[in-house]
Amino acid sequence: MYIKQVTDNKETWWGYLLTTFLIVPIAVILFSIPHGVILTSKAFGDEELMAKIASGDMAAMMSILEPNLNLFLMLLPFVGMLLAVFFSTKIIHKNTIRELTTSREKIDWSRVFFAFGLWGSISATMIFLDYNFFTPENYEWNLNLGPFLILFAIVILLLPIQTSAEEYFFRGYLMQGIGVISGNRWLPLIVTSLAFGLMHYANPEIAKFGNVVYVFYI
């Protein structure tokens, strides 16, 4: 039902290709420019540091700016991605955000908050047990209220946008697009799951815990 509800707009199949290979990349690049400009201005005159930035050395990039500013700038491209997906959904395909989100008549926010509460409770319980019973030496109380409040604001405002951008693009927009173009039910699920997993290949948890972590992405 989720894919079927948008198959009436098959004539806009080209929009899925245009969005995937042009509109989304351009939006991500545009929203990445502030980070690049600030990094370059900070490293200007230091040839070694500039070379590291040009090579994509994440450690070097992270060392240049204040951590909260770095996080804010790194999350900005996801704002561009989400806006691009919404733009294409509304303007090119003439679909609604509700149709991109669910096959139900309206978005069921109670399910969203239930899932958030469930995983939040599981995570909090695991951290509590780990801190109190298993490896308390891995934790250190180091509260600096000013930076913490800034970090809290960034996390509350931008992390939901990051996760929504990824999910809407891969599990929503691409899944519907591949379904519309291929007319197949299984192909969209397989392709988007693999693509979502590969996108997270460079994540640090993959290097630390191994490829088994892919299960959580796929």
List the predicted regions and their residue ranges.
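Hydrophobic transmembrane alpha-helix segments characteristic of membrane transport
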Residues: I91-G117, P136-E140
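Functionally important transmembrane alpha-helices
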Residues: G210-I218
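Membrane-interfacial loop-to-helix junctions in multi-pass transporters
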Residues: L143-A153, S182-I190
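Membrane-interface helix caps and helix-loop-helix hairpins in membrane proteins
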Residues: F134-W141, H200-F209
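N-terminal, membrane-interfacial amphipathic/helix-forming hydrophobic leader that caps
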Residues: M1-T96
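Membrane-interface helix/loop boundary segments of multi-pass membrane proteins
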Residues: A165-V191
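Mid-bilayer segments of alpha-helical transmembrane spans in multi-pass integral membrane proteins
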Residues: F116-L129, P160
